[in-house]
């Protein structure tokens, strides 16, 4: 059975390491803030100028002036700091962010990423995605395995405008977890009840299964 969105976010939260500085992309990745493992102290950063994002607020905690880059209301943890976009992007471009968890519309088995526009459709802009994939030490994609119409999102080549080439290190979907390697995709983990036959049918490229040592 496929993971729910919360289960996907919880799986992605397992990528977090103690003391890391992490950027969560707009959409599904923002749910990761609600699933940070006990004992793991991370600093979540947002391009609009906040370091120290906490979980999403309850009804009595909402502050309309405290938002993330996707304009969602958030909370701030103790010790959080606020700054301008120039400082925020200096953190990103300067290589000071350890991990970015980003959504995607398409990704290839070589780690190419398309996540900012569909030609002919209105978009607000590319946001910080291009800066993130160029400046962050590790990039994890968190997305549904296939599109709403059933078409593949993991492909040999993206046909949407690229955000970055060879930038993705790991792909987490509602069905599985893959590592992007020089030799292609390696299946690390599958959701409970999801078999290889289903995965191969819903993945637009070949992959190998990680060997257990």
Curated annotation (Swiss-Prot):
Give the EC number(s) under which this enzyme is classified.
2.8.3.5
Q: Which domain of life, per UniProt?
A: Bacteria
Q: Which SMART domains does this UniProt record tie to the protein?
A: CoA_trans (SM00882)
Q: Which UniProt keywords apply?
A: Lipopolysaccharide biosynthesis, Transferase
Pathway(s): Bacterial outer membrane biogenesis; lipopolysaccharide biosynthesis
Record's catalysed reaction(s): a 3-oxo acid + succinyl-CoA = a 3-oxoacyl-CoA + succinate
User: What is an annotated GO biological process for this record, any one?
Assistant: lipopolysaccharide biosynthetic process
UniProt family annotation: Belongs to the 3-oxoacid CoA-transferase subunit B family.
Complex formation: Heterodimer of a subunit A and a subunit B.
PANTHER family per the UniProt record, alphabetical: KETOACID-COENZYME A TRANSFERASE, SUCCINYL-COA:3-KETOACID COENZYME A TRANSFERASE SUBUNIT B-RELATED
* Protein name listed in UniProt: Succinyl-CoA:3-ketoacid coenzyme A transferase subunit B
Originating species: Xanthomonas campestris pv. campestris (strain ATCC 33913 / DSM 3586 / NCPPB 528 / LMG 568 / P 25)
Its taxonomic placement starts with: Bacteria, Pseudomonadati, Pseudomonadota, Gammaproteobacteria, Lysobacterales
